Each structure stands twice: as C-alpha cells, then as structure tokens.
C-alpha cells in the first residue's frame, strides 16, 4: 500500500498516518519528521533546511526529493508507505510520479483531508496546549505566526496539488473536520477499494 495524504497544516495528516501505520504495518514518510530529524542531527540537509523551516517557509524541492528517494530505498518502505507532507508542489508531485516510475512503483491512493481553514488555528493552539500539559516540547511550527505563514504557503503553493491528482483520477476527498475515528473509517473505506 502506497499512499499520499494531502491537506493544509493542522488537517490531521500526521494523526491519520500514525493510525494507518498501526493498522496496516506500513511506514509513515513524513517529510516534516524527516527534516526535523535532519535538523536535530545537524546533517548537511538539516542545516540547509533549519532556517527555512523555522520561518515557516518551504524547503527546496531538491532537498525534499533527495530525502524521499533515499527513504524509499530502505527495507521497511518496501511493504508500503504513507507520504505525509509531500508532495507540496505540482513540481514535487511530478517528480514523485517519475521517482516511483523509475522504481517500478505507483501510488495506490491519494487522499485529501478537506478542512475549514478558519478553524485550523484553534486546532493548532489546542495541539500546543496539549503538548505543554504533557510536559512535551511545543513544535516550532505550532507557533501562531509560523502557522499562519505555513497556511499562506500551503494556499499559495500546495493547494494546487489536489487538482493535479484529481485530473489524473487519483484523488479521494474526506471531511477532515470529522472526529478522528470517522476520518480513519473513511480512509479505510477508500483503501479497501484501492
């Protein structure tokens, strides 16, 4: 099973990806997590990405595609994967199609979590408050100003990825504002027919 989860920041892509990993034994390939790990490790890619990520901007396609290509070659990705936070641009979607074709693979599903963007800031603030209450660090990208920058970048650059996949007949849409379990059930229904 190979799939892409689309939606703006705070839509629940990471939450649903984790549930899919637990239910289906596939790996979550979150560019955000991979980039944060590279930043924490101080790798050359991480150093390049750090300043861009902290300001809420998008990391270059070259860096992200390189990380994805390397990750797809790892043994645990052979059973299947979920791409969360990638592709973020039509150029990345096209590059992903080419990368998968070169590896003899294709996507089984592209699922967009449709959300009310006016309510996303509340969702992000709740996520930050929950992290604080648990004594966990708050993600830098959960800062309200950084979140607004990320949402603007999504609307400017990434929102066009859904129509890219829709034009190819690959896009399925789900109400991302529904309760978490309902969203999971809707995704499972799509995957049963994929």
UniProtKB/Swiss-Prot annotation:
Any GO BP annotation: AMP salvage
Keywords, ordered alphabetically: ATP-binding, Cytoplasm, Kinase, Nucleotide biosynthesis, Nucleotide-binding, Transferase
Binding-site positions, AMP: 31, 36, 57-59, 85-88, 92, 139, 150
Broad class of enzyme this protein falls into: transferase
Catalysed conversion reaction: AMP + ATP = 2 ADP
Swiss-Prot/TrEMBL domain comment: Consists of three domains, a large central CORE domain and two small peripheral domains, NMPbind and LID, which undergo movements during catalysis. The LID domain closes over the site of phosphoryl transfer upon ATP binding. Assembling and dissambling the active center during each catalytic cycle provides an effective means to prevent ATP hydrolysis.
Name under which the protein is recorded: Adenylate kinase
């Amino acid at each position: 099973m190979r799939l892409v989860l689309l939606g703006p920041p705070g839509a629940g892509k990471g939450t649903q990806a984790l549930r899919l990993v637990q239910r289906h034994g596939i790996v979550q390939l979150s560019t955000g997590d991979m980039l944060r790990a590279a930043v924490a490790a101080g790798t050359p890619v991480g150093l390049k990405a750090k300043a861009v990520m902290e300001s809420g901007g998008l990391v270059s396609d070259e860096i992200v595609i390189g990380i994805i290509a390397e990750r797809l070659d790892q043994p645990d990705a052979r059973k299947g994967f979920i791409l969360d936070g990638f592709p973020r641009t039509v150029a990345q979607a096209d590059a992903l199609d080419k990368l998968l074709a070169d590896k003899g693979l294709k996507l089984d599903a592209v699922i967009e979590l449709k959300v009310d963007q006016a309510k996303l800031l509340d969702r992000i603030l709740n996520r930050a408050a929950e992290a604080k209450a648990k004594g966990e660090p708050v993600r830098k990208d959960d800062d309200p100003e950084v979140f607004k920058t990320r949402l603007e970048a999504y609307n400017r650059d990434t929102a066009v990825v859904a129509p890219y996949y829709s034009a190819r007949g690959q896009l399925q849409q789900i109400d991302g504002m529904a309760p978490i379990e309902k969203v999971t059930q809707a995704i499972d229904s799509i995957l049963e027919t994929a």
